[in-house]
Amino acid sequence: MSSPEPPTEPPEPDNPTWSTQPTYSNLGQIRAHLLPSKACRLRTPGSLSTNPEPLPPPLPKKILTRTQSLPTRRTLHPSSIQVQPPRRPFLGSHSVDKSQAAVGPACLPAELTFGPADAPLGLSLRDLHSPEAVHTALAARQLQGLRTIYARLRARLMGGHPGPCHPGHSFRLLDSSPCAESGDALYYRVVRAHEDAWHILVAKVPKPGADVPHPWGLELQASLSPHFNLQGLCGLVPEGTLPGAPWRGAVALAAEVPERTVAQWLAEACTQPPEEFVWAVALLLLQLSAALKFLEAWGAALVELRPENLLLVAPRGCATTGPPRLLLTDFGRVCLQPPGPPGSPGPHAPQLGSLLRALLSLAAPSTTPLAAGLELLAAQLTRLRPSASRTRGALQALLWGPGPELRGRGAPLGPWLRALGPWLRVRRGLLVLRLAERAAGGEAPSLEDWLCCEYLAEATESSMGQALALLWD
């Protein structure tokens, strides 16, 4: 209800007079049992005592009002209403009844939740006051982001797989000369078309006089799911489908078009600076160990590891200046090798050790930590004969850490293993930041970036501990 109009002239602050000034009174101050109500009408002092007017009917019961002020909020009681400078800005109000006013605030600040814009944090206000909760949430989000980056890069690198051949496909020979030559096969580029879709494949033609391939290995190659470091087959080119083809009979079709072999690459790469050559050798051996790990999991083993039967392919969707993609193609020398119990000698360790020593001998001696680690790994492969999985873990540790400095000489095993967890979380965060910086600059990721993502996304304290133990125990 609106209040009476204010007087035309303000009263003197020291001596207010009841006879000359209008009086604003509240029935709550006269009657304690009534809540605050409307102001009374003007009356003179005499009329108040001689002829009191009848009281108006009581107003409806009002409810208390709670105000919100910065930085805290509290319930204001009638006894505590007083002027306290400085005044806080009024933000708003909401009404509560007496029962709610006695309870207190609806929720504590520590129990407040964020708005929709803060939902990706996955944290409450109480979690922000706990460093452990913040660190745990950040570590989980970094790992999730790293796995997402790894999956997307893998889809880019392996995207566009042609799939198996069907009777409705047509074929056309692109070149009369081979695009690549391995130790026991020649590769010719072939176009496979069906309606509006087409793919460039390669016909794998055995060389005259080559060793008879093992049939079990060829059956295994035809049944394998796509793997980044194993040559995949798409079917056969029927005899007579390609008139003028420089071969006879049906030949296998492979999905990836090779550029050269590892033996041909070595003839050119050994002229690079020693540091660059050693790094490239480690990346190639890492991919080879991934292929051998897959074979060992299937109960198979490669009888003879020859650089001329290891093909190199340009990875899809990556920078052309990065390392090439390695393909294991010699399935004709793959035989059945049932896996033994955990810790049994790896069937490929001696061959990997010999190949590593041969590769390191082609370049000038290097004093880098990576070169020293590779020489040590070559000796451990011959002496301990680890599995391809452990060899792959050791190569990952040599390329991206952690190094032997994390453990220290003579350090107890327990603190050393506990330090691997924080190291792994920091390393993941740094990799995500580096990839984000490069993506912001428009730089395409390389095959090396994907291999590093694969390592940090899969690594655990246990796997890193086994890799370091293989290298430096």
From Swiss-Prot:
Residues 16-27 have a biased composition (Polar residues). Residues 1-27, 42-61 are annotated as: Disordered. GO terms for biological process: regulation of actin cytoskeleton organization; regulation of cell motility; regulation of cell shape. InterPro entries: MitoQC_Scaffold_Kinases. It comes from the Eukaryota. Disulfide bonds: none annotated. Residues 1-14 have a biased composition (Pro residues). GO terms for molecular function: protein kinase activity. Changing L146E: Abolishes homodimerization and interaction with CRK isoform CRK-II. Belongs to the protein kinase superfamily. Probable catalytically inactive kinase. Interacts with CRK-II and antagonizes CRK-II-signaling. Prevents the formation of CRK-II-dependent membrane ruffling and lamellipodia-like extensions. This is Protein PEAK3. The gene is PEAK3.
